[in-house]
Amino acid sequence: SPKRQELRSLKDINLRINDLPNIKRNKYSVVIDPGHGGSDSGAVGIDGLQETDVVLDVSKIVTKLLLEKGVSVKMTRDKEVEVDLSPRVALANKTNSDIFVSIHANASRGKKRYINGIETFYYSGWRGRLLAEKIQKEILKVSPGSPDRGVRRGRYFVIKRTNMPAVLAEIGFVTGRLDARRLEKKIHRRRVAFAIAKGILEYFKRVG
């Protein structure tokens, strides 16, 4: 039953909180940016799967996991509201966060169902690249069969205008047959959130 499955997946993630790397508590701060929101639903995919819902769900779980590990976290939105790009950047710059992580889901032109995959963008610098590589690697681990579209430089406003290492993760295609089937499931969203949290913590361990 769905209820039992839900319980099993909760147990699954509780066990796994202990599997996340430990870092010095109360030292690091992160801004998590769920893409889109409100009347801006972002990409709309198979069976009406909306990017905004998927990424908000994943972002909330990432936030919860990081808080458990003693990281200070701010979200640019924590409900279905529309937020312009400038205030997202302003929040990160004003709070002087260590890193900025924007979470999105992809769509292919013409909604081609055979296009799936994971990609993570950074704007510049070795720290941005390292953060993107750590997150990309972990998301791929929980998305078997979904192509590795790589870590690339991107000129997105939110990662270009932020003053700290910043990345934009595309966690799969809502228009892709393989990715969409996963992204609509709670358990997969949890796994992706766990992967992103792990990538972030691995990054902090590495840069100190």
Descriptions of predicted regions:
Residues 1-208:
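Catalytic-site microenvironment of enzymes
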